[in-house]
């Protein structure tokens, strides 16, 4: 069976003819003091055949009058119970509120619909377990400045509460409330707004922070320059270009921004300022880019700004490249379409001097550097460990290794380096079987390069081979020594020749 309300909802939207007052009252569609009620669609009602009200306004008025029957009817027609509660609060109709108390999940949900501070506070009081802090927090959430104004004097000395409300307003980006708090209370940490602005990426909030900070400067001694520098560093680090520009309005150094932009590869910021930056600063930025291991695009931007002219900082650049083991700038200079700048040899020298075997091998692979070039430099710098490790890695066969090391000696002019290589070759032969040809070739090699001690050692080793062939070898070595005035080699060769001759005489 249909209820009366269901019949009304179904049939009395647009009756064929006006119903009399008695009929409307019997149907429960008469609102005392207002007239008949008729539903108009889903959101409106018609009162007394004349006035059209929103259904929520109607239910609010009915609740304020304490008219339980009309409230019930309007709820069936789709009215919002929250507006009924608001109306009941306006005229303190608490009995009506008690009827619907169980249908309200959280009284706080109603607060956003209220603009009257008195009603707002009454509604909040329905949450019997809530505190004043909760009231203030919701007031901030709903932009109810009037609530804060009411308790302004009470909170003036509560530093903790003021700070909490200020930061909450900042997080909610409620600019009116933020401004009111900053202007009416003493906020201990006024700078908290900047941290929140960075997190929210809210430039308006950021600008407000500077306005408050400048106001505070008139009554407090603060290091404004230090604050701006800190902001510039962070904004540039995060690539917040608009924040950088905003901070620079109040002072600060562009250099601070540039060094952070290079370090964190924010080319938009870098490109904006680079063309007005002094050359000396750009050179420092390039060195910083190496230290920070900047990206290829960042490095190219700096190099192009210098027009690839780096002669004034070559030593510093090489030092930075080797120290930080970051070779990108060397590669970019080498890849330049015109007027390539080859710093590979210069870097190699410094790497061999200061770096490990693994780092040098990596450099060799990256720039296609031959092992011979590396070994030459290592010999000049007396890096025995590198000579051993690299030659062993490249030429695993010992005879092959000796062959290549001998070729390097032939092409070297550095005397101490040659000697070091020749000693290294001799050390390899100590653990290697050599046939007569290989042994004689190495002996002659030492004679050619005036390595007296090694020549003598090889001569002694060669006595296990045919003495006639050895005497012929010594004659050749003597001829070489006389030709180049290698006195000690000549004396040693003569001595061994006489020794062989004496052996033959004794055998006769």
Swiss-Prot record:
Keyword line: ANK repeat, Early protein, Repeat
Residue ranges that the Swiss-Prot or TrEMBL entry lists as coiled coil: none
Domain of life: Viruses
InterPro entries xref list: Ankyrin_rpt-contain_sf, MGF_505
ANK repeats: 54-83, 253-282, 313-343
Pfam families xref list: DUF249
Keyword Zinc-finger: no
Induction: Expressed in the early phase of the viral replicative cycle.
Family that this chain belongs to: Belongs to the asfivirus MGF 505 family.
Entry function: Plays a role in virus cell tropism, and may be required for efficient virus replication in macrophages.
Record-given protein name: Protein MGF 505-9R
Species this protein is from: African swine fever virus (isolate Pig/Kenya/KEN-50/1950)
């Amino acid at each position: 069976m249909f209820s009366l309300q269901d019949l009304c909802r179904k049939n009395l939207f647009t009756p064929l003819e006006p119903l009399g007052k008695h009929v409307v009252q019997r149907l429960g569609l008469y609102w005392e003091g207002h007239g008949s009620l008729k539903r108009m669609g889903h959101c409106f009602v018609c009162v007394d055949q004349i006035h059209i009200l929103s259904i929520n306004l109607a239910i609010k008025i009915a609740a304020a009058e304490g008219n339980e029957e009309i409230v019930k009817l309007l709820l069936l027609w789709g009215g919002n119970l929250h507006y009924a509660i608001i109306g009941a609060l306006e005229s303190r109709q608490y009995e009506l509120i008690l009827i619907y108390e169980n249908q309200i999940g959280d009284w706080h949900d109603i607060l956003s619909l209220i603009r009257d501070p008195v009603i707002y506070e009454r509604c909040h009081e329905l949450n019997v377990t809530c505190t004043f802090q909760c009231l203030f927090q919701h007031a901030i959430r709903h932009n109810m400045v009037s609530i804060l104004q009411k308790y302004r004097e009470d909170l003036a000395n509560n530093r903790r509460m003021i700070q909490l409300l200020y930061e909450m307003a900042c997080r909610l980006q409620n600019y009116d409330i933020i401004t009111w708090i900053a202007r009416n209370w003493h906020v201990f940490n006024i700078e908290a707004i900047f941290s929140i602005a960075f997190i929210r990426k809210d430039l308006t909030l950021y600008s407000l922070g500077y306005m408050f900070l400048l106001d505070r400067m008139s009554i407090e001694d603060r290091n404004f320059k230090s604050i701006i520098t800190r902001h510039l560093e962070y904004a540039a680090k995060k690539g917040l270009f608009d924040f950088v520009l905003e901070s620079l309005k109040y002072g600060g150094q562009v250099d601070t921004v540039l060094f952070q932009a290079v370090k964190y590869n924010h080319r938009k910021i870098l490109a904006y300022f680079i063309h007005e930056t002094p050359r000396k600063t750009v050179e420092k930025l390039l060195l910083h880019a190496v230290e920070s291991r900047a990206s290829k695009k960042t490095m190219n931007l700096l190099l192009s700004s210098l027009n690839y002219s780096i002669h004034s900082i070559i030593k510093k650049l090489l030092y930075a490249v080797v120290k930080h083991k970051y070779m990108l700038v060397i590669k970019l200079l080498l890849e330049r379409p015109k007027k390539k700048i080859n710093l590979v040899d210069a870097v190699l020298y410094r790497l061999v001097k200061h770096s490990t075997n693994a780092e040098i091998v990596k450099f060799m692979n990256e720039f296609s550097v031959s092992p011979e070039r590396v070994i030459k430099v290592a010999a000049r710098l007396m890096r025995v460990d590198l000579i051993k490790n690299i030659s062993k890695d490249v030429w695993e066969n010992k005879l092959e290794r000796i062959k290549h090391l001998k070729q390097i000696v032939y092409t070297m002019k550095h005397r101490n380096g040659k000697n070091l290589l020749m000693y290294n070759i001799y050390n390899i032969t100590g653990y290697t079987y050599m046939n007569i040809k290989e042994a004689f070739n190495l002996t002659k090699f030492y004679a050619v390069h005036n390595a007296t001690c090694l020549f003598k050692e090889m001569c002694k080793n060669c006595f296990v081979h045919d003495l006639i062939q050895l005497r012929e070898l010594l004659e050749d070595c003597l001829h070489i020594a006389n030709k180049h005035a290698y006195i000690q080699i000549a004396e040693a060769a003569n001595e061994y020749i006489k020794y062989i001759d004496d052996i033959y005489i004794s055998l006769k």
